């Protein structure tokens, strides 16, 4: 079963093969804290962009994470990211897609527990 989502203006949309994970993630790094993400993680093969009319990319610090956002309405869409472990380490090859769960159709934040990752001190 696939789930879908889109930005506020609808110019960018995506589909995911699968469901919302049991837990979502909130990172405390400077970028995620300011943007208010709740992330749902997926392997790249399970995620596809179905519309990208105003997709823009922001990279910072080590430039290893591509943060996609809508240049029209400003919604954060997803990040193509290393598959960081809880301690901040990475194997150098495995990637994941961190979807802003708030954009998933019919998403209810209260329905899922949230794990906090201490990105403020890890990277």
What are these regions (language model features)?
Residues 1-123:
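A short Gly-Trp-Pro
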